[in-house]
Amino acid sequence: MLGAVKMEGHEATDWSSYYGEAEAYSSVGNMNAGLSMNPMNTYMSMSAMRTSANMTASSMNMSYVNTGMSPSLTGMSPGTGAMTGMGTGVPSMASHLSPSMIPMSAQTTAMNALAPYTNINSMSPIYGQSNINRSRDPKTYRRSYTHAKPPYSYISLITMAIQQSPNKMLTLSEIYQWIMDLFPFYRQNQQRWQNSIRHSLSFNDCFLKVPRSPDKPGKGSFWTLHPDSGNMFENGCYLRRQKRFKCEKKPSLREGGGKKLSEGASSVGSAANSSSESSVGNESPHSSSSPCQEQKRSLVDMKSSQGLSPKHATSPASQAQHLLSQHHSVLSHEAQSHLKPEHHYSFNHPFSINNLMSSEQQHHHHHHHNHHHHHKMDLKAYEQVMHYSSYGSPMAGSLAMSTVTNKSGLESSPITSDTSYYQGGYSRPIMNSS
């Protein structure tokens, strides 16, 4: 066998060097090195430590001799000559193998076609690709992680931006820019989240719009935090807002005048009702009560007895009239209803779905709030739509049916004020939309 291999090799020095290196391997490995005289073949045989793998490697060499690899084989004549030499080498090699290996040598010819591709693929391309993928994974992970959506609500983002500004005031464009500078995530889909920022500014009473003063020329009004908003977030962390403050924020919800109205009305009193509506942004910040909820509750109770009864009676009797007079009644009702803040908190938009869901939310917030909310719905022309009032709860249905009769009870509770306020701000559109 060695003689035949040497004849093919033509160079004893090369053979001896290969033979010395392959000494550690089985006779098949030695045969491989001698047959191919090709560094690539030795690499393949070394990568496959088992004798069967070595045999496939040798057969692989044989199959490649005819193809493009033959020119690179040193000392082997390209073309069929090398193939014939190898053919002679394989049988002789099989004779030297142990009996158990002999059948494998017979199979080498059948393996010629498949072995080269399987071995080559397994040797470099797959491993190389896997290494490349492994090196890329951390980068892609880091990249996606740094651009992940921040765990802050839009209200938190706006509050952070305003609080970190020197003047505690920012224009809308400055708020956008601050968010984009701090959070790369918001550098994409700007139109989408900027709409949400505008909604948050408009629909949360904790944000006040401050018109530009003559000494500060420029475009756009300033936005600042309500002086009574206090610490809106738990433990100074922007991840979670305190429910209490949410109610505070929302008491004057959006309604233009109604928003700051409720706060202004509660602090100023019934006299401020008409002015508070117009004073929406400016008056409410100054006149709004810092203990919004508590002050509003007391005011609500007081005012519910004062102007609530006349206006409340009108609202259930004729919702259209109540809608017209809602602004006045709304002012008093807003001040009267501490529920109004929570109601704002519970609903994001004055639509029937939110009102329906408010029953559950109110259960969580305050039990009597359920009554308020349901009654609110009832006062709002939801009485006409029976399933709305009944949906909230049987209590809601009863309240709706007996809005006029239970007027005394309604007056005692901020429910009526809430309902009238809500009507004042939204009753007509809400009724239409619902």
UniProtKB/Swiss-Prot annotation:
Composition-biased stretches (Low complexity): 263-291, 317-333
Biased composition (Polar residues): 408-422
Principal location listed in the UniProt entry: nucleus
Classification via InterPro entries: Fork-head_N, Fork_head_dom, Forkhead_box_C, FOX_domain-containing, TF_fork_head_CS_1, TF_fork_head_CS_2, WH-like_DNA-bd_sf, WH_DNA-bd_sf
Compositional bias (Basic and acidic residues): 249-262
DNA-binding residues (ranges): 149-243
Tissue distribution of the protein: At gastrula stage, expressed in both the anterior and posterior endoderm, with endodermal expression persisting into early tailbud stages. Expression is absent in gastrula stage ectoderm. During tailbud stages, expressed in the pharyngeal region, the neural floor plate, the midbrain, hindbrain and in cranial neural crest cells. Expressed in the foregut of hatching larvae. In tadpoles, expressed in the pharyngeal pouches and in other anterior endodermal regions.
Mutation effect (residue 199 to C): Abolishes DNA-binding activity and reduces ability to inhibit mesoderm formation
UniProt-annotated stretches for the region Disordered: 249-339, 408-434
Protein name in the entry: Forkhead box protein A2-A
Organism: Xenopus laevis
